[in-house]
Amino acid sequence: MRECISVHVGQAGVQIGNACWELYCLEHGIQPDGQMPSDKTIGTGDDSFNTFFSETGSGKHVPRAVYVDLEPTVVDEVRTGTYRQLFHPEQLITGKEDAANNYARGHYTIGKEIVDLVLDRIRKLADQCTGLQGFLIFHSFGGGTGSGFTSLLMERLSVDYGKKSKLEFAVYPAPQVSTAVVEPYNSILTTHTTLEHSDCAFMVDNEAIYDICRRNLDIERPTYTNLNRLIGQIVSSITASLRFDGALNVDLTEFQTNLVPYPRIHFPLVTYAPVISSEKAYHEQLTVSEITNTCFEPANQMVKCDPRHGKYMACCLLYRGDVVPKDVNAAIAAIKTKRSIQFVDWCPTGFKVGINYQPPTVVPGGDLAKVQRAVCMLSNTTAIAEAWARLDHKFDLMYAKRAFVHWYVGEGMEEGEFSEAREDLAALEKDYEEVGLDSTEADDTAGEEF
């Protein structure tokens, strides 16, 4: 079996986790108490969904997941909520005091007290696996736990499970709306620390998803539940090929192989289609080519940046539902003829396709319409460098005045870590710039250095 362990860190990670596991349970017909009426082979775990759920002798299905937060309130909602019986109590780990939006608290002072406990729980889950494939880590860049504790955990996971893949789903600080003043600090510190430990990081920013909810679903004031359910659909699409048998299946390492041309350039952009409300879906056909085209519109991306300003290095299209390869090939051919989409000249083909016959499931009473087919596009484009540039700029404005730095230093960090992290991100921006150059231009610049 190729199992995956999900780790949900901090408030954002836990709440996205709730949306994801709610959706997985609906997709597999697992009840909130973990029973699965359709599963006839009790206790033997040879079905595809066993990559995400382990089975007990009594036929209960338990998510292979750990929830971690340094303060209890958010995880307490899981402990008392609808799915309280789904999780093993040991899988829900909470500390006593908050990381207070402070990377240093999450990474040094408070994080280090709880990290061994978390690794112990992860070890127990890993021991139940026959062939652990890797980890999916859900967190935000802006919070203290999400940034600080995640980077600590990633470092330790690299030590304990060296070769296993680690994929991140990270909530990137939105350009306009912000939940904390120090988000740029936390984001840049965590990106620097996890850059070498993460194999692939899918970023979503709240503002982009707000806009999608407002525009496509006509929700005037989207709540976090609305946002997370949409993120849940995306995560479900990415992991569907791990949980169902399909025509063209994709496993964790395959994402990396096809999306990451260089180890540091591992931040694909995520787009999902169709995001549509039930009233509208009733009147629309949504063919394969329509939903494929929708993916290439900047308005449907999960991070605010404009791929028309950048070049695509690789592109992964994950279809689910009533889709046949013939339609997909036609849709891709049509896109290639449109000259609006530019690929780097050293990667001419650049499309990987996954098809899964399990149609998308939606949460009953939710905002999304039930559709016959959906597509999730993961594209590695140089345009995402815009997102880093924005963040770096905000970091510079604050750091020039050393604003808020004393909170971090007071928790045992050194000021040098800030400048080191900032230099690393400057290098990352440069890497993106160089990757986007045509191979002939790149050779010229290399020649000038010597």
Curated annotation (Swiss-Prot):
Residues involved in Mg(2+) binding: E71
Gene Ontology biological-process entries: microtubule-based process
One Pfam family here: Tubulin
Gene Ontology cellular-component annotations: cytoplasm; microtubule
GO MF annotations, alphabetized: GTP binding; hydrolase activity; metal ion binding; structural constituent of cytoskeleton
Sequence positions bearing N6-acetyllysine: K40
Cofactors demanded by this protein: Mg(2+)
Record note on modification: Undergoes a tyrosination/detyrosination cycle, the cyclic removal and re-addition of a C-terminal tyrosine residue by the enzymes tubulin tyrosine carboxypeptidase (TTCP) and tubulin tyrosine ligase (TTL), respectively. Acetylation of alpha chains at Lys-40 stabilizes microtubules and affects affinity and processivity of microtubule motors. This modification has a role in multiple cellular functions, ranging from cell motility, cell cycle progression or cell differentiation to intracellular trafficking and signaling.
Active site positions: E254
Residues binding GTP: Q11, E71, S140, G144, T145, T179, N206, N228
PROSITE patterns the record matches: TUBULIN
EC number: 3.6.5.-
Swiss-Prot/TrEMBL catalytic activity: GTP + H2O = GDP + phosphate + H(+)
Alphabetical keyword list: Acetylation, Allergen, Cytoplasm, Cytoskeleton, GTP-binding, Hydrolase, Magnesium, Metal-binding, Microtubule, Nucleotide-binding
Function: Tubulin is the major constituent of microtubules, a cylinder consisting of laterally associated linear protofilaments composed of alpha- and beta-tubulin heterodimers. Microtubules grow by the addition of GTP-tubulin dimers to the microtubule end, where a stabilizing cap forms. Below the cap, tubulin dimers are in GDP-bound state, owing to GTPase activity of alpha-tubulin.
Subunit field text: Dimer of alpha and beta chains. A typical microtubule is a hollow water-filled tube with an outer diameter of 25 nm and an inner diameter of 15 nM. Alpha-beta heterodimers associate head-to-tail to form protofilaments running lengthwise along the microtubule wall with the beta-tubulin subunit facing the microtubule plus end conferring a structural polarity. Microtubules usually have 13 protofilaments but different protofilament numbers can be found in some organisms and specialized cells.
Similarity annotation: Belongs to the tubulin family.
Identification of the protein by name: Tubulin alpha chain
Annotated organism of origin: Lepidoglyphus destructor
